[in-house]
Amino acid sequence: MEGAGYRVVFEKGGVYLHTSAKKYQDRDSLIAGVIRVVEKDNDVLLHWAPVEEAGDSTQILFSKKDSSGGDSCASEEEPTFDPGYEPDWAVISTVRPQLCHSEPTRGAEPSCPQGSWAFSVSLGELKSIRRSKPGLSWAYLVLVTQAGGSLPALHFHRGGTRALLRVLSRYLLLASSPQDSRLYLVFPHDSSALSNSFHHLQLFDQDSSNVVSRFLQDPYSTTFSSFSRVTNFFRGALQPQPEGAASDLPPPPDDEPEPGFEVISCVELGPRPTVERGPPVTEEEWARHVGPEGRLQQVPELKNRIFSGGLSPSLRREAWKFLLGYLSWEGTAEEHKAHIRKKTDEYFRMKLQWKSVSPEQERRNSLLHGYRSLIERDVSRTDRTNKFYEGPENPGLGLLNDILLTYCMYHFDLGYVQGMSDLLSPILYVIQNEVDAFWCFCGFMELVQGNFEESQETMKRQLGRLLLLLRVLDPLLCDFLDSQDSGSLCFCFRWLLIWFKREFPFPDVLRLWEVLWTGLPGPNLHLLVACAILDMERDTLMLSGFGSNEILKHINELTMKLSVEDVLTRAEALHRQLTACPELPHNVQEILGLAPPAEPHSPSPTASPLPLSPTRAPPTPPPSTDTAPQPDSSLEILPEEEDEGADS
């Protein structure tokens, strides 16, 4: 956008001011706006102005089921969006910010209703910029001026902090503070002035003019060859930060930051190795590992074979009991029989607990009634095209229902959460025994139960780890996703929640899960499976120039089109490529199980505004006689709702 004497070089919507509703009773607690970088009259200005919310553009909001919160994964506006699939955990709402396009002038009266909040500052007046900690929610930037005052914190609800910092770096030199990696000291892009500033502050041990001239002439090679790592940029050369650089800053707002805003070490990975998968383990091969007393022998070798080739279908019913921890790898045949008898008694005792509840008791137990209603609804829509569950009177549906209700008795704290029926269905299909399937399901839930906890911390942590792996493996793809407001990887949420159950054909899901259950070649292989899928689709995503809506649509249209063997081969190759890197960052080593985890940090006291997990079964009244048509999913599309309070 250009006008008389000014040119807009950067513009980003969805940038909010978070005001105090108690202090400003006549104003919204969230003020939507647009941030711009404007060249005007031989100066460069940073300008923020509020906008008016109007229109009918479509946004995709990932949210907890039956909730109204959070739009931190909102997409860019487009006139229409027809997903052509069933977007689980997606809310479709209609919001379009209407921008106030006016020439930014200092001291001018704003035309927007909330324009008293508008501001414009010359980049030369900036002293420092503080960014928020990495995470899975909104990011903010706090700008401090040379006079010591601070501008209102800018909250980027649709991403864009990195893009803004990249634009600012064209006009300023942003030096990461050695004391605080989230604090950038601002210096002008003038070689002599910058050298004098460095010399005066004694930031460099060596001649500062030489460093500055090399940086300005060739910033790329100077940054990577002289300073080696992005995270350590200027850290080894900078002396302790000048007093007052951080003291002028206000305390950071109580908001979670933008997804993945983390500068990691720049590592050079070696060539990706070639991987060949083996044939499935057969019954004859399995039998060779069974000793005289029925005890399995050479278990590590057997697990490695399962990892590299999977299991033949006829062997799964027996082998899955070991992979899921129902039977011990070290136990004898007699010990296994005794264990099964004990677990059978335990199962039916728990089943009797809910079976013996009378209708009158259930009416006074809203929690149990809520679980039962949710399970009945989900079971009727789980894998209904599979013959084992086909038809309303199919006994397989009854077994699904009974096992899930019994699990509520087994795990009172967790109960039933939508998505669990998707995890149980393949297990029951393979095991074909109610008791054995229940205990195998419990073993699987031990691995993934954190995905369904109401705190959502496990899902946030997994998405953060996935982003970290992807940034090491393919930083260009990460930058592209960031530029399209998809850097939080919300479109991968369903993959991780139910371990790709909806992405592959049913037989391929069985193969994928048994490989993942081996725990080889290390923990979090499912994250590398996600990286492998994105790696396979990177050219399509990047060369097609997809926006956030198209990325979401394309990812969901991959359902049932992926080859599990190709994905597993690529995931293993990615693992070998990472483990062969001698300078792999420690946090990546932790994810791959190559290094012990660091001391756990205290969880953030502020809950994320983005509900990332499906809804727990709520206490519900008895169902009415009128029922709406149900989609073919145990995780349904939320009805269209007003966006009221989504950003609060």
Swiss-Prot record:
Region named Disordered: 240-259, 594-648
Region (Required for interaction with OPTN) location: 218-309
KW Transport (keyword) present: yes
UniProt modified residues of type Phosphoserine: S602, S604, S608
Segments of skewed composition (Pro residues): 597-624
Record's compositionally biased regions (Low complexity): 625-634
Secretion signal span: none
Site (Arginine finger): R377
Keyword Oxidoreductase: no
UniProt GO cellular component terms: autophagosome; cytosol; recycling endosome
Protein name stated in the entry: TBC1 domain family member 17
